[in-house]
């Protein structure tokens, strides 16, 4: 009798993987055409537990080196993706080992660490830190980044000791590009120490920062952003949340956190998932698809046009309009400048973005452990959008 192949059920295009102690949230894209779609483990000795998680199901294997293990991911109950775990030690691993975050405090009874940040005139969150024992560098905290980044000019000027050891596909707001990557780096920011940090090297010409600290630096943590005190507090578990906060669900799309927001024109509400992006110096942005579907192109007053460049280096044009009303959780904002893509970049499915010109108006508790964010208006709520 043939051995029954295990099956993982999902309704989505991506699933999560836990390899040993490393958890990769919504990282594995299901590929029914691959036959098989192969996941190669990192080298190990003895045995290792590999688990796959969908939104409603899970499947675990105890694996040994130099073996292959087959299973099926059944998408929407009808489309099978034949998948294989490959533990051969000389194969190139599919995923890099996850970074490790530790507190340098010797007595941390509070189970939290507090970092002081500076809010730039561009609305970005700046932290002072080091990479691989470098001199002090300017980091920005970017929840819209699924990996940390070093600016290419720092490496070229030999201001940081970062060894580039491969290539990786990078998806930015302007499209997809191949960039150099580095593994096994060390970050130090305040009382926090990260080891085994993967980095991308991106040519951020003209951008006022040295490093990008992606949200994955705090995976499985709770991050509290207080713009009244300029404190970024890292908790191991959710602190007490007062009733003034509005709770929103987080949905991870291609490894980036999104929240639902509403635009309101002439009493008509349009809702979509927006990239929760503290690394954006803008207000809100929507794609041409969203604009066309919700009749925004010829309805709103155009107040300007611009040409932008994202992390892939490609230029794209936008028009700026005044959105009469925007709803974020239980809170409403009025006459919000918003950009609309003239044409959506290729290779990027989700174009809606809420940047830190808006997000800075809310103190936030971001629960990366349970996929939720809590927002409360702060002293910046009524500040100008300019």
Regions found by a protein language model. Name each.
Residues 1-386:
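Pepsin/retropepsin-fold aspartyl endopeptidases
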């Amino acid at each position: 009798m043939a051995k029954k192949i295990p099956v993982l059920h999902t309704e989505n295009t991506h699933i999560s993987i836990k390899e040993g102690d490393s958890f990769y949230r919504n990282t594995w894209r299901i590929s029914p055409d691959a036959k098989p779609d192969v996941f190669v483990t990192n080298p190990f000795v003895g045995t290792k537990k590999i688990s796959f998680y969908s939104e409603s199901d899970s499947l675990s294997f105890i694996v040994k080196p130099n073996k292959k293990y087959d299973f099926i991911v059944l998408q929407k109950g009808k489309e099978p993706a034949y998948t294989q775990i490959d533990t051969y030690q000389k194969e190139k691993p599919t995923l890099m080992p996850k970074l490790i975050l530790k507190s340098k405090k010797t007595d941390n009874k509070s189970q939290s660490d507090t970092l002081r940040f500076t809010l730039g005139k561009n609305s970005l969150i700046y932290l002072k830190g080091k990479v691989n024992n470098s001199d002090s560098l300017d980091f920005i905290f970017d929840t819209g980044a699924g990996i940390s980044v070093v600016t290419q000019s720092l490496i070229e000027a030999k201001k940081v000791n970062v060894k580039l050891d491969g290539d990786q596909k990078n998806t930015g707001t302007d499209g997809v590009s191949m960039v150099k990557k580095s593994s096994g780096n060390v970050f130090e920011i305040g009382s926090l120490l990260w080891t085994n940090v993967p980095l991308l090297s991106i040519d951020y010409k003209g951008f006022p920062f040295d490093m990008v600290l992606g949200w994955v630096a705090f995976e499985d943590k709770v991050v509290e952003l207080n713009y009244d005190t300029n404190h970024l507090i890292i908790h191991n578990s959710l602190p007490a949340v007062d009733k003034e906060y509005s709770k929103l669900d987080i949905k991870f799309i291609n490894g980036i956190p999104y929240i639902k927001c509403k635009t309101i024109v002439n009493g008509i509400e349009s809702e979509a998932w927006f990239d929760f992006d503290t690394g954006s110096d803008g207000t809100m942005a929507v794609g041409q698809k969203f604009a066309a579907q919700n009749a925004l192109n010829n309805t709103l007053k155009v107040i300007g046009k611009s040409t932008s460049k994202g992390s892939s280096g490609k230029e794209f044009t936008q028009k700026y309009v005044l959105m009469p009303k925007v709803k974020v959780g239980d809170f409403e904002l009025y006459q919000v400048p918003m950009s609309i893509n003239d044409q959506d970049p290729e290779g990027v499915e989700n174009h809606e973005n809420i940047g830190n010109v808006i997000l800075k108006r809310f103190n936030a508790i971001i629960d990366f452990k349970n996929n939720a964010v809590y927002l409360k208006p702060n002293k910046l709520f009524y500040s100008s959008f300019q």
